[in-house]
């Protein structure tokens, strides 16, 4: 089985929930501009609406907001919507960009009252900047240290009242003190296919694509519950329809296009199937350690564990057990193989 040698190939998978190279502008054009336009996440939308409306009636700033969940579900879009709903300016940065306390102090000093500060990947913020953020979130001030050693002095600086919106794909990686300073936390879940159909219909309208209802359902079914993936697959299918058909996307056109791009009926791509194939054919379904499995497909263990495994576990094709990874009966049947008699759930597997 061939190695996926180029890291960019792994990162630019059609079913990757992360933004790929050159995708930012197109992704931005499809973003909803208000809570009313935002599709899916009904509980989060309702809760956010109450938080924002309450703040507007009081004439103050809402509590700091933490948005958590897998990539590609709309956390950045919601941050933009929060600023728009409040009629406030949005300042954007990311956790990795805040390496020093001075980086954060410079950004905070430029805020004006009621601004929204969005920190993406907030779990990756450096500790000195995080500790400065505590005081800014609680008391709207920061202490800037001038000088070094015994002669260093701390100068307090006032910060205009602002709302921090943090986004994270790993809420468990946040420190307790930082997490506790968010007054409202929303967890975003994967989308149902019917919700993705609505996302696709909206995007098709914006992009001027003729998309049949059955075609939308076909694309939605393969989009791994993620709007960003759905929109990417829509653009790939559009290219196929324009080059090899009359530009109209029917169900058959969608199926043919996604076969070309190696996205099967459950949303698995070539790398996913390579992992399942190694697990079933080379290791008889497991259990097997992730490092051994990674060697079998010629990949890094972190790639298998962080890129492939989350979806395969959620799709019910791989189970994590104390003894290692195990292929479920669904994995065997998806590959057209007969599950062994001693499959998952049999006595002794989890001993």
From Swiss-Prot:
Residue ranges of the region described as Disordered: 1-23
Positions annotated to bind Mg(2+): 76
Reaction(s) catalysed by this chain's protein: ATP + H2O = ADP + phosphate + H(+)
Principal place of residence: cytoplasm
Disulfide bridge partners, by residue number: none
Region annotated Head domain (RuvB-H), chain positions: 265-351
Any one of the GO BP annotations: DNA repair
Positions of region (Small ATPAse domain (RuvB-S)): 192-262
Positions with a binding annotation for DNA: 320, 325
Composition bias, Acidic residues: 1-12
Keywords of the record: ATP-binding, Cytoplasm, DNA damage, DNA recombination, DNA repair, DNA-binding, Hydrolase, Nucleotide-binding
InterPro entries assigned to the protein according to its UniProt record, in alphabetical order: AAA+_ATPase (IPR003593), AAA_lid_4 (IPR041445), DNA_helicase_Holl-junc_RuvB (IPR004605), P-loop_NTPase (IPR027417), RuvB-like_N (IPR008824), RuvB_C (IPR008823), WH-like_DNA-bd_sf (IPR036388), WH_DNA-bd_sf (IPR036390)
GO function terms (MF aspect): ATP binding; ATP hydrolysis activity; four-way junction DNA binding; four-way junction helicase activity
Record-level GO cellular component terms: cytoplasm; Holliday junction resolvase complex
Chain segments carrying region Large ATPase domain (RuvB-L): 1-191
TM stretches of this protein: none
CDD domains the UniProt entry points to: AAA
EC number: 3.6.4.-
Subcellular location: Cytoplasm
The protein's assembly and partners: Homohexamer. Forms an RuvA(8)-RuvB(12)-Holliday junction (HJ) complex. HJ DNA is sandwiched between 2 RuvA tetramers; dsDNA enters through RuvA and exits via RuvB. An RuvB hexamer assembles on each DNA strand where it exits the tetramer. Each RuvB hexamer is contacted by two RuvA subunits (via domain III) on 2 adjacent RuvB subunits; this complex drives branch migration. In the full resolvosome a probable DNA-RuvA(4)-RuvB(12)-RuvC(2) complex forms which resolves the HJ.
Entry remark concerning the domains of this protein: Has 3 domains, the large (RuvB-L) and small ATPase (RuvB-S) domains and the C-terminal head (RuvB-H) domain. The head domain binds DNA, while the ATPase domains jointly bind ATP, ADP or are empty depending on the state of the subunit in the translocation cycle. During a single DNA translocation step the structure of each domain remains the same, but their relative positions change.
Recorded family membership: Belongs to the RuvB family.
Function summary: The RuvA-RuvB-RuvC complex processes Holliday junction (HJ) DNA during genetic recombination and DNA repair, while the RuvA-RuvB complex plays an important role in the rescue of blocked DNA replication forks via replication fork reversal (RFR). RuvA specifically binds to HJ cruciform DNA, conferring on it an open structure. The RuvB hexamer acts as an ATP-dependent pump, pulling dsDNA into and through the RuvAB complex. RuvB forms 2 homohexamers on either side of HJ DNA bound by 1 or 2 RuvA tetramers; 4 subunits per hexamer contact DNA at a time.
HAMAP family cross-referenced by the UniProt entry: DNA_HJ_migration_RuvB
PANTHER family per UniProt: HOLLIDAY JUNCTION BRANCH MIGRATION COMPLEX SUBUNIT RUVB (PTHR42848:SF1), PTHR42848
Protein name as annotated: Holliday junction branch migration complex subunit RuvB
Organism: Mycolicibacterium smegmatis (strain ATCC 700084 / mc(2)155) (Mycobacterium smegmatis)
Name of the gene encoding the protein in the UniProt record: ruvB
């Amino acid at each position: 089985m061939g190695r996926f040698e180029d890291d960019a190939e792994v990162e630019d998978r059609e079913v990757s929930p992360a933004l790929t190279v050159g995708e930012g502008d197109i992704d931005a054009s499809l973003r909803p501009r208000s809570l009313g336009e935002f599709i899916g996440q009904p509980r989060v939308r309702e809760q956010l609406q109450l938080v924002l409306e309450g703040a507007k009636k009081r004439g103050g700033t809402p509590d700091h907001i933490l948005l958590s969940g897998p990539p590609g579900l709309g956390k950045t879009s919601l941050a933009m919507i929060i600023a728009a709903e409040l009629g406030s300016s949005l300042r954007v940065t990311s956790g990795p960009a805040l390496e020093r306390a001075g980086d954060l102090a410079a950004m905070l000093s430029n805020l004006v009252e009621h601004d929204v500060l969005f920190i993406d990947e907030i779990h990756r913020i450096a500790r000195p900047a995080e500790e400065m953020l505590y005081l800014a979130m609680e008391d709207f001030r920061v202490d800037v240290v001038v000088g070094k050693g015994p002669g260093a002095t701390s100068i307090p600086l006032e910060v205009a009242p602002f709302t921090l919106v943090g986004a994270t794909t790993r809420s468990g990686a946040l420190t307790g003190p930082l997490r506790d300073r968010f007054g409202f936390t929303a967890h975003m879940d994967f989308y149902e296919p019917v919700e993705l159909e609505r996302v696709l219909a909206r995007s098709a309208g914006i992009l001027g694509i003729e998309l049949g209802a059955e075609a939308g359902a076909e694309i939605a079914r393969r989009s791994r519950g993620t709007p960003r993936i759905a929109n990417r697959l829509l653009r790939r299918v559009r290219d196929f329809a324009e080059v090899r058909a009359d530009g109209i996307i029917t169900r058959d056109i969608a199926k043919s296009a996604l076969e070309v791009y190696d996205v099967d009926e459950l949303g698995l791509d070539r790398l996913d199937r390579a992992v399942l194939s190694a697990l079933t054919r080379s290791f008889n379904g497991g259990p097997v350690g992730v490092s051994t499995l990674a060697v079998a497909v010629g990949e890094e263990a972190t790639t298998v564990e962080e890129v492939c495994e989350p979806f395969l576990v959620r799709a019910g094709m791989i189970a994590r057990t104390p003894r290692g990874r195990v292929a479920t009966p669904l994995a065997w049947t998806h590959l057209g193989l007969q599950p062994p008699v001693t499959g998952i759930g049999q006595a002794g597997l989890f001993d």
